[in-house]
Amino acid sequence: MAEAKPAPEKEAAAKTESVPVETEGEGPSVKEGSTSLVSIDEYLAAGVHIGTQQKTQDMMRFVYRVRTDGLYVLDIQSTDERIRVAAKLLSHYDPSRILVVSSRQYGQHPARMFSRALSTKSMLGRFIPGLLTNPQIHGFFEPDIVIVTDPAGDAQVLKEASSIGVPIVALCDTNNLTSNVDLVIPTNNKGRKALSLVYWLLAREVSRLNSTPFNYELTDFETPL
């Protein structure tokens, strides 16, 4: 049986605060005294904080700064915190009932490795409409919870999971809408290294919470060039 559906992220904050403009040398950080899953330098090196030059009202609460070139920068502390929250949520589910999906090229290998590490179900590449809603389709699967790499690229999965009441965890960039997302992980969801780091951390944290072995290095999750 599926866990109770988490509180949805379907509405952004009523008011959007002005976002400070980033000057040279400034970058996202975590609060003093807090401990991140990996060092801030590792997050920065992977480009997890790098957003796009577009932003949505939904994602503004996760924006740290906007650079002088118009690029929105995500708050690494929020990313780190949301990975922990998502891992805790996922740890309560039977892995065989968890579905991870990615249509994005650079998300497919990390999602595949996440699935392998935790023994979850994965659907990678082009998603055939009806796989979550039509029992007559070959490969039909009704998960208890879904992880999507990009709400835009995985829009059909998002639509079907939402229609059957399945909770959705999504990796969301600054340009994403989150209307059908139940738990947002704010991150660069287009970069090769960013996606590998987020999926690796998520898998590692779920394994830790479930007290199961995790024998994978970050490089195992990186899409080969």
From Swiss-Prot:
Keywords tagged on the record: Ribonucleoprotein, Ribosomal protein
Keyword Ribonucleoprotein: yes
Compositional bias annotation for Basic and acidic residues: 1-14
Gene Ontology biological-process annotations: translation
One Gene Ontology cellular component annotation held by this UniProt entry: small ribosomal subunit
Region (Disordered) location: 1-33
HAMAP family given in the database record: Ribosomal_uS2_A
Name of this protein: Small ribosomal subunit protein uS2
